[in-house]
Amino acid sequence: MPGDYAPPQGRLLLARSQGELAGCVALHPLEPGICEMKRLYVRPQYRSQGVGKALLKAALAEARAIGYRRMRLDTVEPVMQDAVRMYRAHGFREIVPYRANPMEGALYMELELIE
C-alpha cells in the first residue's frame, strides 16, 4: 500500500466481525518520533460493541512497536463526543493545533506512548 499509511512508518488496520469489515484506523508519521492517528471509523451496525476501543488499542500497540514516542489526532468534539471520551479515557490530552482543520469545533489531542 503506497502513501502516508504504508509500512514501515505507517499502518492501516482493519477490524472484522464474522468475516465482515467492522471498522478501520490508520497511522502515519508527522515528524520524528510522532505519529498521527487518522481514519478511526466503525460501521454503524458495529458501534457500542468495543470495536472502536479495540482499534484504538491496536493502533497504540503498533505505534509503540514502530518506535513512536507520541501519538496525535484531531477530531471534531461536538460531532464525535463518544470518540473524545474514549480518547480521554486512554490518556489523550488536549494540545494546541498542530495543523489546520477547517471544521468548527476541531480538537487536537496527544498521548505520550513511552511509559
Question: Language-model features: where?
Answer:
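Conserved G/P- and acidic residue-centered "switch" motifs that form tight phosphate/ATP-binding loops
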Residues: G19, G50-G52, G67
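Conserved GNAT acetyl-CoA-binding A-motif
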Residues: A63-T75
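Conserved beta-strand-loop-alpha-helix junction that forms the acyl-donor binding cleft
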Residues: P44, L73-A83, A100-E104
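Acetyl-CoA-dependent GNAT
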Residues: M1-K38, R43-P44, L56-A58, E62, ...
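Conserved acetyl-CoA-binding loop of GNAT-fold acetyltransferases
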Residues: Y87-V96
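Alpha-helical macromolecular-interaction surfaces
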Residues: G50, A54, A58, Q81-D82
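Glycine-rich ATP-binding loop(s) of histidine-kinase-like ATPases
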Residues: R47
